[in-house]
Amino acid sequence: MDKTSINKVVLAYSGGLDTSIIVKWLQDTYQCEVVTFTADIGQGEEVEPARVKAEAAGVKEIYIEDLREEFARNFVFPMFRANAIYEGEYLLGTSIARPLISKRLVEIAKQVGADAISHGATGKGNDQVRFELNAYALNADIQVIAPWREWDLSSRESLMDYAQKHGIEIDYKKQSKKSPYSMDANLLHISYEGNILEDPWTEPEEDMWRWTLSPENAPDKVEYVEMTFKKGDIIAINGKVMSPASVMEDLNKRAGAHGIGRDDIVENRFVGMKSRGCYETPSGTVMLKARRAMESLTLDRAAAHLKDELMPKYAEMVYNGFWFAPEREMLQAAIDKTQETVSGVVRLKFYKGNVTVVGRQSKNSLFSEKIVTFENDDGIYNQRDAAGFIKLNALRLCLNTIK
């Protein structure tokens, strides 16, 4: 990349150590103006301090946006209509946040006339791929600056030294008290990587977890929760109508208090290596359980089975950074078609780390008590018909035995 061609860069900025250093590094290395963009996607931290830090770094254009509702409504909820899980365990909490951030970076870059966007993802992880693939899908001509792939800073200590050398104000007391884990949080989850978790045999310490009680310490009392669905999306909890973001915030607190949503996973990164991560996803765990219960009542068998076959591919697209790809949008259209009848109420029971479905009802239910009953069905179903059904399905099996 020709550094002289870069006059203005939009940086995905948190105000933390890494991105604070990136501001100065971009200014010095590219001799460019830096515009910062900070998104509130439910990470649970104040975002306004990022404005103060950016101003102190000489940034003139600062964007801070509350994107919680857009994140929940246009990204998380559509993904959950697919019941997407990566490698059978990961609910894609980090993966699904990247397309929205990329989208706003590209939009702001166009708005302010920037030549490039920049992010603080490392050269080893998935996020660099996700940020950039999603950005290129929206603007093929956008230039991307990834400092971790360019500079020679390789550790937290080297970052601290750089900050001290260049007069970047860092709260060293806060840094010393900072979690030893690499963390990422949003409305859907909080993730933990690094430190002792790099040994897949080592159990995480209990004080690592922030959103959930341990199941052992969760209340000895059951909580029942009713969730109302409309066309595949949750619209109310216990009869109270809520926005998508409010649904997730409510479930994070409610389910987290019962120790629901912890997971410890070794996953295959898109870049080729395996990594271990621990996740707290209270709302996602509950939503997935409730959604599958609602679909079990309202979806046709063949449609449900085909949807389940497509789900791993959909999850892989989200994980790898292909949210804006035509194949994901094609699958989304098919999935959304299946959700037209997925409306009704699911009743759940929360208790000590477990979420159990205990009831479901829908005006679109395909469940027939009259047909399935063990009692007299008044001749609706003729059991003699099963003999021909079995014989036809057994034909190929019988042929294998004929010599």
From Swiss-Prot:
Family matches, as InterPro entries: Arginosuc_syn_C, Arginosuc_syn_N, Arginosuc_synth, Arginosuc_synth_CS, Arginosuc_synth_type_1_subfam, AS_cat/multimer_dom_body, Rossmann-like_a/b/a_fold
CDD domains (alphabetical): ASS
Entries under PROSITE patterns matching the protein: ARGININOSUCCIN_SYN_1, ARGININOSUCCIN_SYN_2
GO MF annotation list: argininosuccinate synthase activity; ATP binding
Its EC number(s): 6.3.4.5
Any one GO biological process: L-arginine biosynthetic process
Subcellular localization, as worded in the UniProt entry: Cytoplasm
Binding site for L-aspartate: 122, 126-127
Reactions it catalyzes: L-citrulline + L-aspartate + ATP = 2-(N(omega)-L-arginino)succinate + AMP + diphosphate + H(+)
Superkingdom classification of source: Bacteria
Family label: Belongs to the argininosuccinate synthase family. Type 1 subfamily.
UniProt-annotated binding residues for ATP: 12-20, 39, 120
Residues annotated as binding L-citrulline: 90, 95, 126, 130, 182, 191, 267, 279
Keyword ATP-binding part of the UniProt annotation: yes
Protein name: Argininosuccinate synthase
Disulfide pattern: none
